[in-house]
A protein has these predicted regions:
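Phosphate- and other anionic-substrate recognition elements at nucleic-acid/protein interfaces
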Residues: 1-168
Length: 168
Protein backbone atom coordinates (compact mmCIF):
# COMPACT_ATOMS: atom_id res chain seq x y z
CA UNK A 1 0.00 0.00 0.00
CA UNK A 2 1.04 3.61 -0.45
CA UNK A 3 1.55 6.66 1.70
CA UNK A 4 -0.44 9.69 0.59
CA UNK A 5 -0.46 13.36 1.51
CA UNK A 6 -3.06 16.07 1.38
CA UNK A 7 -1.86 19.66 1.40
CA UNK A 8 -3.61 22.95 2.11
CA UNK A 9 -0.85 25.28 0.97
CA UNK A 10 -1.82 28.71 2.24
CA UNK A 11 0.51 31.69 2.60
CA UNK A 12 0.11 32.06 6.37
CA UNK A 13 -0.25 28.46 7.55
CA UNK A 14 0.51 25.71 5.05
CA UNK A 15 -0.52 22.31 6.37
CA UNK A 16 0.12 18.72 5.38
CA UNK A 17 -1.71 15.51 6.25
CA UNK A 18 0.17 12.21 5.83
CA UNK A 19 -1.80 8.95 5.66
CA UNK A 20 -0.43 5.43 5.39
CA UNK A 21 -3.06 3.52 3.41
CA UNK A 22 -2.28 0.35 5.38
CA UNK A 23 -4.35 1.95 8.15
CA UNK A 24 -7.98 3.01 8.25
CA UNK A 25 -8.46 6.60 7.06
CA UNK A 26 -9.13 8.30 10.39
CA UNK A 27 -7.75 11.44 12.00
CA UNK A 28 -5.87 9.45 14.64
CA UNK A 29 -4.11 7.40 11.92
CA UNK A 30 -2.75 10.47 10.15
CA UNK A 31 0.15 12.77 10.91
CA UNK A 32 -0.49 16.50 10.49
CA UNK A 33 2.08 19.24 10.04
CA UNK A 34 1.65 22.99 9.89
CA UNK A 35 3.92 26.01 9.59
CA UNK A 36 3.28 29.21 11.58
CA UNK A 37 5.26 32.32 12.49
CA UNK A 38 4.13 32.23 16.15
CA UNK A 39 6.60 30.35 18.36
CA UNK A 40 3.82 29.07 20.66
CA UNK A 41 2.76 26.63 17.92
CA UNK A 42 6.27 25.21 17.42
CA UNK A 43 5.59 21.90 19.18
CA UNK A 44 3.83 18.56 18.94
CA UNK A 45 0.17 18.12 19.82
CA UNK A 46 -0.12 14.30 19.67
CA UNK A 47 -0.28 13.59 15.92
CA UNK A 48 -0.35 17.29 14.98
CA UNK A 49 3.08 18.87 14.63
CA UNK A 50 3.70 22.61 14.51
CA UNK A 51 6.80 24.15 12.97
CA UNK A 52 8.12 27.69 13.14
CA UNK A 53 8.21 29.60 9.86
CA UNK A 54 11.79 30.70 9.21
CA UNK A 55 12.42 34.41 8.86
CA UNK A 56 12.83 35.67 5.32
CA UNK A 57 13.92 38.85 3.60
CA UNK A 58 11.76 38.61 0.46
CA UNK A 59 8.94 36.58 -1.09
CA UNK A 60 11.25 34.23 -3.00
CA UNK A 61 13.05 33.27 0.20
CA UNK A 62 9.70 32.82 1.95
CA UNK A 63 8.40 30.55 -0.82
CA UNK A 64 11.64 28.56 -0.91
CA UNK A 65 11.66 28.07 2.88
CA UNK A 66 8.04 26.88 2.96
CA UNK A 67 8.47 24.53 0.00
CA UNK A 68 11.66 23.06 1.53
CA UNK A 69 9.76 22.43 4.76
CA UNK A 70 7.01 20.65 2.84
CA UNK A 71 9.25 18.59 0.56
CA UNK A 72 11.33 17.48 3.56
CA UNK A 73 8.20 16.08 5.23
CA UNK A 74 6.98 14.42 2.03
CA UNK A 75 10.35 12.77 1.46
CA UNK A 76 10.69 11.70 5.11
CA UNK A 77 7.45 9.72 4.78
CA UNK A 78 8.24 8.53 1.23
CA UNK A 79 5.06 10.10 -0.16
CA UNK A 80 4.59 9.43 -3.87
CA UNK A 81 1.15 10.98 -4.41
CA UNK A 82 -0.18 14.31 -3.14
CA UNK A 83 -3.56 15.97 -3.35
CA UNK A 84 -3.04 19.72 -3.08
CA UNK A 85 -6.18 21.79 -2.84
CA UNK A 86 -6.84 23.74 -6.02
CA UNK A 87 -7.46 27.46 -6.06
CA UNK A 88 -10.92 28.58 -5.06
CA UNK A 89 -13.01 30.35 -7.67
CA UNK A 90 -13.41 33.27 -5.27
CA UNK A 91 -9.67 33.92 -5.02
CA UNK A 92 -9.52 37.37 -6.55
CA UNK A 93 -7.63 39.44 -4.00
CA UNK A 94 -4.22 40.93 -4.77
CA UNK A 95 -2.37 38.02 -3.17
CA UNK A 96 -3.61 35.51 -5.76
CA UNK A 97 -0.35 35.89 -7.68
CA UNK A 98 1.71 35.39 -4.52
CA UNK A 99 -0.32 32.28 -3.69
CA UNK A 100 0.27 30.95 -7.21
CA UNK A 101 4.01 31.67 -7.08
CA UNK A 102 4.29 30.09 -3.63
CA UNK A 103 2.45 26.97 -4.78
CA UNK A 104 4.57 26.79 -7.94
CA UNK A 105 7.72 26.47 -5.81
CA UNK A 106 6.25 23.43 -4.07
CA UNK A 107 4.81 21.86 -7.23
CA UNK A 108 8.17 22.20 -8.97
CA UNK A 109 9.98 20.52 -6.07
CA UNK A 110 7.41 17.71 -6.02
CA UNK A 111 7.93 17.27 -9.76
CA UNK A 112 11.71 17.10 -9.26
CA UNK A 113 11.18 14.47 -6.52
CA UNK A 114 8.86 12.32 -8.68
CA UNK A 115 5.83 12.97 -6.51
CA UNK A 116 2.55 12.79 -8.41
CA UNK A 117 0.23 15.74 -7.81
CA UNK A 118 -3.53 15.96 -8.17
CA UNK A 119 -5.46 19.18 -7.53
CA UNK A 120 -9.06 18.64 -6.47
CA UNK A 121 -11.23 21.74 -6.23
CA UNK A 122 -11.99 22.99 -2.72
CA UNK A 123 -15.67 22.22 -3.38
CA UNK A 124 -14.84 18.55 -4.04
CA UNK A 125 -13.01 18.22 -0.73
CA UNK A 126 -15.79 19.98 1.19
CA UNK A 127 -18.50 17.85 -0.42
CA UNK A 128 -16.60 14.63 0.39
CA UNK A 129 -16.25 15.59 4.02
CA UNK A 130 -19.50 17.45 4.80
CA UNK A 131 -21.82 16.45 1.96
CA UNK A 132 -22.01 20.08 0.82
CA UNK A 133 -19.53 21.63 -1.63
CA UNK A 134 -19.90 25.18 -0.35
CA UNK A 135 -19.35 24.39 3.34
CA UNK A 136 -17.47 26.84 5.51
CA UNK A 137 -14.42 25.91 7.58
CA UNK A 138 -16.48 25.60 10.76
CA UNK A 139 -18.65 22.96 9.05
CA UNK A 140 -15.51 21.01 8.15
CA UNK A 141 -14.39 21.13 11.79
CA UNK A 142 -17.86 20.15 13.03
CA UNK A 143 -17.90 17.18 10.64
CA UNK A 144 -14.63 15.93 12.15
CA UNK A 145 -16.03 16.29 15.67
CA UNK A 146 -19.27 14.52 14.68
CA UNK A 147 -17.67 11.70 12.66
CA UNK A 148 -14.63 10.97 14.79
CA UNK A 149 -15.19 12.83 18.07
CA UNK A 150 -11.95 14.74 17.47
CA UNK A 151 -11.66 18.44 18.24
CA UNK A 152 -8.51 19.99 16.77
CA UNK A 153 -9.05 23.32 18.57
CA UNK A 154 -9.06 21.52 21.92
CA UNK A 155 -6.00 19.48 20.94
CA UNK A 156 -3.99 22.59 20.04
CA UNK A 157 -5.39 24.60 22.94
CA UNK A 158 -7.03 27.50 21.17
CA UNK A 159 -10.53 28.78 21.77
CA UNK A 160 -11.89 29.06 18.26
CA UNK A 161 -11.62 27.85 14.70
CA UNK A 162 -8.86 30.24 13.77
CA UNK A 163 -5.52 29.26 12.27
CA UNK A 164 -3.92 26.73 12.58
CA UNK A 165 -7.08 24.73 13.42
CA UNK A 166 -8.87 25.96 10.31
CA UNK A 167 -5.87 24.98 8.14
CA UNK A 168 -5.58 21.44 9.46
Amino acid sequence: MAIYAGIDYSMTCPSICIWDSNKELKFENCQFFFLKKEAKFNKDFKNVHGFLLESYSNDMERFDNASEWAITILNKYNVKKVAIEGYSMGSTKGLIFNIAENTAFLKYKMFKNNIEVITPAPTTIKKFWTGKGNSKKDAMHDALVNKENYNVADLIGIDSLKSPTSDI
